[in-house]
């Protein structure tokens, strides 16, 4: 509770300049298991945005990771990966390839990496930010046309990604409509994140020739994405998304607050947790991008999640979920991510027509069985 108060006060100071006087303070994350927040009105919001340009370079599970290229070790190069809640820098809505390049070169004002929390396990900050951005983007598309049939086309990830929204009659109350649009946007953004894990396992490569299999179904990934969806919805519902600039500054404030609420620890303690799992969840003797540097994966794709259980953690985990229903509307009846056959599907079987979230468990179960077989052969 002290951390919540502390970060509410810090948020007030951060956002009190006249430039951002339209922001209502304080910003407090809603980390109840099921979201409780509702909009009190239809707030001013961003105009229709460009889709996020790719994803931030995220972290393989572990720290001080060695790297190799074409099977040859890269000398004197290590990936630290560990960050702290109070050292995450700024947030920038990721609609430019320059942002990803800056992250790769280590010159970004954003700090991304992994940290450990008592209630949320390991959190990947890049995944939090990416799904927060996707939620804002989808809200900018969904809110102006809520209830109308539309298709939002995203870039390919093995499959053509189409977000199909169905026609329906929205609530008459404006605040209820606004709330429904925010939660529908977070619901769809999480489906986009879940598909990314599947696509990585089946051969998707952001950079051709560089396998991303090491990152597929990493134990912290989808809980981190879910956290990002929840935080973005919280900001939208509190009126903190009237512009990209306002959203960026609000994310800069809410993210550390949420991490402290989850029980974020120091970088030293995060590294200790990694050390305790070395040989079980990851293999410090392997190098990026070897797939089985990561030994533990979480193949569940639901948006009702607990953190992947840490054997040594006695503190209760925090379950988070997205609303499956709001104001009498079932989210699954309002829209879905459709994955149509793409130009290069690698190991992904071609769908009869398209995949949806209903197919995710079977695709993930196949991945789990294949990985288990390969790990058994390695022992």
What are these model-derived regions, one by one?
Residues 224, 228, 232-234:
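Alpha-helical segment that forms one wall of the substrate-binding/catalytic cleft
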Residues 197, 221, 227:
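Divalent metal-coordination and catalytic microenvironments
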Residues 1-9:
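Bacterial N-terminal signal peptides that target proteins for export
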């Amino acid at each position: 509770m002290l951390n919540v108060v502390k970060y509410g006060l810090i948020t007030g100071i951060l956002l009190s300049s006249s430039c951002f006087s339209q922001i209502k303070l304080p910003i407090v994350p809603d980390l109840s298991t099921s979201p409780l927040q509702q909009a009190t009105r239809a707030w001013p919001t961003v105009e229709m945005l460009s889709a996020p340009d790719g994803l931030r370079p995220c972290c393989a599970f572990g720290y001080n990771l060695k790297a190799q290229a074409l099977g040859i070790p890269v000398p004197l190069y290590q990936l630290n990966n560990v960050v702290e809640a109070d050292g995450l820098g700024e947030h920038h809505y990721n609609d430019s390839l320059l942002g990803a390049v800056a992250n790769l070169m280590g010159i970004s004002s954003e700090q991304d990496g992994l940290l450990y929390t008592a209630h949320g396990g390991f959190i990947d900050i890049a995944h939090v930010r990416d799904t927060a951005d996707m939620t804002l983007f989808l809200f900018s598309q969904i809110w102006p046309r809520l209830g109308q049939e539309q298709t939002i086309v995203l870039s390919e990830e093995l499959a053509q990604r189409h977000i199909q929204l169905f026609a329906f009659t929205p609530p008459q109350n404006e605040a209820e409509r606004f709330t429904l649009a925010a939660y529908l946007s977070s619901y769809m953004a999480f489906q986009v994140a879940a598909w990314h894990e599947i696509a990585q396992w089946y051969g998707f490569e952001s950079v051709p020739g560089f396998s991303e299999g090491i990152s597929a179904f990493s134990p912290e990934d989808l809980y981190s994405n879910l956290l990002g969806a929840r935080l973005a919805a919280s900001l939208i519902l509190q009126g903190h998304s009237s512009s990209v600039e306002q959203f960026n500054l609000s994310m800069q404030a809410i993210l550390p607050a949420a991490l402290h609420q989850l029980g974020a620890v120091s970088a030293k303690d995060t590294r200790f947790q990694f050390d305790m799992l070395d040989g079980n969840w990851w293999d410090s003797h392997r190098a990026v991008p070897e797939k089985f540097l990561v030994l533990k994966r979480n193949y569940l794709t639901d948006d009702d999640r607990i953190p992947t259980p840490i054997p040594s953690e006695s503190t209760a985990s925090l379950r988070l979920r997205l609303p499956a229903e709001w104001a009498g509307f079932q989210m699954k009846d309002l829209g879905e991510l459709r994955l149509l056959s793409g130009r290069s599907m690698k190991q992904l079987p071609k769908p009869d027509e398209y995949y949806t979230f209903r197919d995710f468990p079977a695709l993930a179960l196949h991945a789990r069985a294949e990985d288990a077989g390969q790990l058994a052969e390695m022992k």
